[in-house]
Amino acid sequence: MKASDLKNMSVEELTAKNVELTKELFNLRFQLHTGRLENTAKISAVKKDIARVNTFLSERRG
């Protein structure tokens, strides 16, 4: 996810994206512990996306 995509989103869209990414991270961690996850780099990529979304949310709110 690029920062330019997030810049154009509203607070509601960013909040929804944050929830979506958090659920995806939960599923990836579950797959990791059950041995089904092949691409472990996906976890860190999703965590970075969550951080980007949270950064834009704090900019908008505050």
Curated annotation (Swiss-Prot):
Molecular function in Gene Ontology: structural constituent of ribosome
Alphabetized UniProt keyword annotations: Ribonucleoprotein, Ribosomal protein
Pfam families, per database record: Ribosomal_L29 (PF00831)
InterPro entries tied to this protein: Ribosomal_protein_uL29, Ribosomal_uL29, Ribosomal_uL29_CS, Ribosomal_uL29_sf
GO BP term, pick one: translation
Domain of life: Bacteria
GO cellular component, one term: cytosolic large ribosomal subunit
Family recorded in the similarity comment: Belongs to the universal ribosomal protein uL29 family.
UniProt-recorded name of the protein: Large ribosomal subunit protein uL29
Gene: rpmC
